[in-house]
Each structure stands twice: as structure tokens, then as C-alpha cells.
Amino acid sequence: MRALIPRIPTGRGVAAATLATAAVSLSGCGFLMGNAFDIEVGECLASVPQDGEVFNVETIDCAETHEGEVYANVTLDDGDFPGVKKIEKTVDARCSEEFESFVGIGYNDSELEFTSLYPTEESWNTWDDRQVTCIIADPEGTTGSLKGAER
């Protein structure tokens, strides 16, 4: 399972979700249902999950309207599961650092949001999951990449 934590500037609201793995399968309208562990930098998500359990993510060609784009994958240090609070603090810092180099302006100056997928204790211990996936989001939807968007 992967946990999803939105990092949204004050006043924009906060939600949480849990992601579990799913097999890759083709769906209509250009969507590709994919494994939450396998999304790569540059892939776009039709929508960003907001809460509850999700068994797959919908990737889509970035040329089509979408809500999110993977802008970084970072690896957490090995060792015992550090706990949710420590992971969230690390994730927030690492995704914030990567945000500016991707968007072109700092997170606090941006109208865009980010969220992140990170290991749960189960995925950490069972599958040696150490990957954090940082996802930039435009809740209004966007077309094309948000790389260098400077907004």
C-alpha cells in the first residue's frame, strides 16, 4: 500500500488516501490504469485521488486534460520503518525541494499544489518500498506538462 498526502498551501484544504497496487490494464478515453508503485517522472494522472482506498492510478497522455503530473521520485533511507510522522516530514521537505526545480518558482509562490505517494509500514516491510512519488497538481485541470510553468 502507498499512502497519499496532499501538501496544499494554507486555506486550500487537506485530504488523505491510501493506494494499493494494481495490475496494468487498458481503459477507455486514453486512460491507462496503472500500478501505484510504477508511475514515473513525466507521467500525467487524469485525476489525483483525494481520500479512501484506491487500487490503481489513471495515467493519461499529458497532451490531454489532466489534474496531476509526477515531477519527482525520491528514495528514502533503508532501515526500520521510521513512522508516519517522520516520513511525512521527510516527504514534505523532499517534494518541496524538487518543486522549484520542476516548476521554476518556489512552492509558496505557486498557485499549483503537490501531493505525494509514500510507503506504508506494510509496503516498507513486505516489499522494501522506499520510493516517494511527488505529484504536482492543478485542481482546475491542465493540458501539457507543468514543467517550467512558473505559476
Where are these regions (language model features)?
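Primary mode marks residue(s) on the alpha4-beta5-alpha5 output face of response regulator receiver
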Residues: 29-151
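Sec-dependent bacterial lipoprotein signal peptides
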Residues: 1-27
